[in-house]
Amino acid sequence: MKALVLAGGSGTRLRPITHTSAKQLVAVANKPVLFYGLEAIAAAGITDVGLIVGDTAGEVPRAVGDGAKFGLDITYIEQSRPLGLAHAVLIAHTYLGDDDFVMYLGDNFIVGGIDDLVRTFRDGRRPAARILLTHVSDPSGFGVAELDDDGRVVGLEEKPRHPKSDLALVGVYFFTPAIHEAVRAIEPSWRGELEITHAIQHLIDNGADIQSMVIEGYWKDTGNVADMLEVNRTVLEDLEPRIEGTVDEHTVVIGRVVVGEGARVTNSRIMGPAIIGAGPEISDSYIGPFTSVGDNCRITGSEMEFSIMLAESAITGVRRIEGSLIGRNVQVTQSLHAPNAHRFVLGDHSKVEIQS
């Protein structure tokens, strides 16, 4: 069994961050979202991975390499334009061959991994495809499944205006080689994309057995800032505390906190769960719960909580930042007057002056 991991796409809902960075490489708890998926695939015993890249064809390979650090053998497959999930399967046919495979969207996050899902697909009576579903409050932004009274999949719609159920497709799919004929048979949707929902519907219409499983655990598509912050919160809730850097005697550390190698924290208060990467300098500051501070950041005389601060950025003299995603190489500095809190989405290399 192989894996096909999708790490292309433009990430419009995470702009301006994604103007200069692949959405799958935005870090939660100081680890790129994509890495969680690759680790889950490796933990499930799959070693051969085809990684779809598009505009990310330079950045993703630099971050992931050949896959050896994950215990994987990665082959990169370039998708010239984001033409749909089924198009990704179409261009990966040569790589996938006649193997069963799991397709994993690289910006999705699932608590608990996919070990059991892979095992039951391998060992059971294999359907042509198995899809994962979850109940959502607003299914109109997702692929949506319609089930019969016995739980069989009878229909799929892609981002319907009037959904027939609240069961959204989770970004993990299991396929046999039957899917290859289906992706060749369908036409582009009104969006100009080959939709995987249409390919699965083609299988249904031709009598194939399509199984579903409703997952009850935590799942998020990290396509927007709010969901990225929630995934960061979820990961930090299971943080194993450790102090590898330097914390002076005037600093108070409470709860589950990680201070990375080479970090220096002076005269500050760190309230977990929170993670500080390798090399930051934090002084005279408050770092509150559910905050991730990336490598080589600087925070001076500031307060921040429930936020993600990516590597190489600096915050100076800011009274309070919360619910924010701050890109790489960003500078946030004090100005004259500050409100009680600030909320940002800052792209890489931004510079913001704040009144205090």
Curated annotation (Swiss-Prot):
Member of which family?
Belongs to the glucose-1-phosphate thymidylyltransferase family.
Keyword Flavoprotein tagged: no
One annotated GO biological process: antibiotic biosynthetic process
Q: In which pathway does it act?
A: Antibiotic biosynthesis
Question: Pfam families, per this entry?
Answer: NTP_transferase
EC number assigned by the record: 2.7.7.24
Question: EC class of this enzyme?
Answer: transferase
Q: What is this protein called?
A: Glucose-1-phosphate thymidylyltransferase
Cofactor(s), names only, from the UniProt record: Mg(2+)
| Claim: Repeat is one of the keywords in the record | no
Q: Which reaction does it catalyse?
A: dTTP + alpha-D-glucose 1-phosphate + H(+) = dTDP-alpha-D-glucose + diphosphate
Keywords on record: Antibiotic biosynthesis, Magnesium, Metal-binding, Nucleotidyltransferase, Transferase
Q: Coding gene?
A: oleS
Residues that coordinate or bind Mg(2+): 107, 221
Q: A Gene Ontology MF term for this entry?
A: glucose-1-phosphate thymidylyltransferase activity
